[in-house]
Amino acid sequence: MKIVLDKDGLMSVLQQAAQDFDWSSLQSAADEYAGEEVMGCAEEVHKILNGLTRGHESTVLYATWGLVKSMLEAVAVQRGLMIVSENRYFDLIQDSVGRDSKWTRAFRAAWGLDPTASQYQSRGAAALTLYSLTAAMFDELIPEKHRNVVNTTMHLIKEAGYS
């Protein structure tokens, strides 16, 4: 990011401090946050499954939005991504997971970025896949106290024929 005006040089110092920040002291908290987000999105999975079963577009889309937003935040925080601009948010997260990964394909489909799968049913199914892949990616980070919720949610997704 280019600093436009910095008469006394303080902005340059602040910018450098942000770029040099060491995330390692926060990694355990970031891991915990990611595990909490996966568990918390079990509710969104239930809403998506229910909406798909009932053919209720608004339920699926709103729950998909919540799930995708939370999974993006979980990855960004857990990986300690420095978001240099909101315009790079999605790029940085996709790059950190891998542009050609199943996770990125599921994210893009759930977010409606796949022109061949823009119907709400496809987006809901992609969101369920995104949840499953995020839960698997963060499996070691999910605390034992949340394990039953996440495992039950994963079972429901598979039982419903998704993932």
Task: Annotate each language-model stretch with its function.
Residues 14-30:
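Membrane-interacting alpha-helical segments
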Residues 1-19:
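A surface-exposed, charged beta-strand/loop segment in the N-terminal or early-internal portion
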